[in-house]
Amino acid sequence: MIAALPRLHAVTDDRVVGAGAVVERAAAMAAAAGPALAVHLRTRALEGGALLDLARRVKDAVAPHGTWLVVNDRADVARAAGAAAVVSGRGGLAVRDLRRVAPGIAVARSVHDADSARAAEAEGADFLVAGAVFETPSHPGAGSGGPELVRAAAAGGRQVVAIGGMTPALAGAIIEAGAWGVAAIRALWDAADPAAAARAFLAALPATRTTPLVVNGESRAVPEGTTLAGLLEQLGLDRRAVVVEHNRRIVRRDALDGVPLAAGDAVELIHFVGGG
């Protein structure tokens, strides 16, 4: 299971990195948002050594507040810097290859439609970064998927972070559509007061309507109020052919309807084949 995924993600781009003050602004946001924040280093402007140096300085600045460091695409840098996660973009390394380079950290995939979301789930990505949800200057002319993209990405049960044109005013509708959290570039990094901007985003996020849990070692999110029986139904499994272990305790079939799932629960589903 990955550690509790932050709900607010501050993502850099080449412009933000080129402007400087990434460490200082990241530190200010981390002081305001703590473990609810992840700082993503996403840039093609820095070579490996320079990116690693920046990643380590950001990690030193945000870690005391419980904030995540996330590195995009460069699993080697993520591992060396002690990042909490690595995100593979369009055309990037497969999840299994990222895990080979950076074992023990969360692996996410950028997705842009229902097909890429399903592919990322099949690969075993821990969470998805879905976008662009709204029109954004960082990807002009790329279009936007809106809440429908979020719903499609969340349909498979992975936690979804929505990115693209995000503002505090838009965040609520995206969470209602099924996102776990939101990511922003300009609304955070370009703010006159990054700490205040981070607080504004967090204040705008309604309580999530999904429950994060682990099923057979993989992170998933299910609708709030789901029971063990409901989980089996969502997965298309017949309770008569599955042994269900909930937080290391076997649950009888006739009790599955009465066991609600809570955040952080661990579920093991063991298929068996009868014979005669």
Please name every model-derived segment.
Residues 1-95, 100-126, 142-145, 157-160, ...:
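Conserved N-terminal beta1-alpha1 strand-loop-helix module at the mouth
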Residues 88, 130, 184:
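Short beta-strand and adjacent tight-turn residues that come in two discontinuous sequence segments
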Residues 126-133:
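Non-cysteine beta-strand/loop elements that form the S-adenosyl-L-methionine
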Residues 137-141, 161-164, 218-221:
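Short, glycine/charged-rich beta-strand-loop motifs at protein surfaces that mediate ligand recognition
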Residues 139-144, 148-151:
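Substrate-recognition "cap/lid" segment bordering the active-site pocket of phosphatases
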Residues 209-275:
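Ubiquitin-like/PB1-type beta-grasp interaction modules and other compact soluble beta-rich domains
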